[in-house]
Amino acid sequence: MRPAQASIDLEALRHNYRLAKRLGGSKALAVVKADAYGHGAVRCAQALEPEADGFAVACIEEALELRQAGIRAPILLLEGFFEHDELRLIAEHDLWTVAATPQQVRALAEFQSPRPLRVWLKLDSGMHRLGLSPEDFRAAWLRLRGLPQIASLVLMTHLARADELDCSRTDEQAVAFALTAGGMRAETSLRNSPGLLGWPALRNDWSRPGLMLYGANPFPQDTENTAQLRPVMTLRSRIISVRELPAGEPVGYGARFVAERPTRVGVVAMGYADGYPQFAPNGTPVLVDGQVCPLAGRVSMDMLTVDLTDHPQADIGTPVQLWGDAPQVGALAAQCNVSAYQLLCGLKRVPRVYMGEAAAKEGVTR
């Protein structure tokens, strides 16, 4: 068996969810869209369901996967629905939906639902992606709030730059949301992961932690709050070949690395097809049996190479850690000029191994 694998620590996932609840002082929907950011949506939801207030996914297909796996907790569709026919499935499977466009609001107003629906009305407070204008938001509130097919409304918006702690845009969005939603008696949802970790003055009834659940820091620097996160995924492999090269010999495609001295090179079963960043620069830290070794040469589809010259004990079969507690995925992403979101969601081929499942089956552990 190829040695590449991702270890998923479900107890760390539960720890991070509890941290989100504690920081938010509110209910929290665990965001498990995109296959739980590459961690496995079903397994993560099963681990969290005993204590989670609910889950959030991007679309109905992701929600139905959870329902079919036996998840009975509330599930919110963050993008709402795309076709009128989906409303029947939303009602049938007891899902919650976002309404972020006038078309979605109109469809909800006209839908004869067999059961009242819980709708999250989304304001565009400055993200300018999904969301209603302030005028349409107020009109939607007035149109939907008294309808028999609407069980309740939650008012929400999405923060665009909360991962920039010195940016005023987050406060501006919070003010815009408060001004527009003022006088509307309903629960609210504002804070995402960076909003929870970096903006303690923000308040809402429902938070939506995503990236932080998986132990990744959304900021370029550590803070008191991010230091409490526990990495959920550890990406591991092993050395599958070792060779000795004289000074002046190149390694890999494009000869991006050239040995400046007699060099011992280790080949690791991990490449960009596995989700490791293709353009990670020379010197990117790779943990070889607990010792940092520098990446040496361009990452290939299935393999990468590291300089083992200063680690003579390393040999074929030696374990390698690509990210986890060290190096952390956020730091690796910054070094490679990508985002932690992209790295985590990009793991398609690597098999996942889950730890901490016994605690999930036996109930909540504190």
Curated annotation (Swiss-Prot):
Substrate binds at residues 129, 301. One of its GO terms (biological process) is D-alanine biosynthetic process. The keyword Isomerase applies. Catalyzes the interconversion of L-alanine and D-alanine. May also act on other amino acids. One of its GO terms (molecular function) is pyridoxal phosphate binding. This is Alanine racemase. Pathway: Amino-acid biosynthesis; D-alanine biosynthesis; D-alanine from L-alanine: step 1/1. Keywords: Isomerase, Pyridoxal phosphate. One of its GO terms (cellular component) is cytosol.
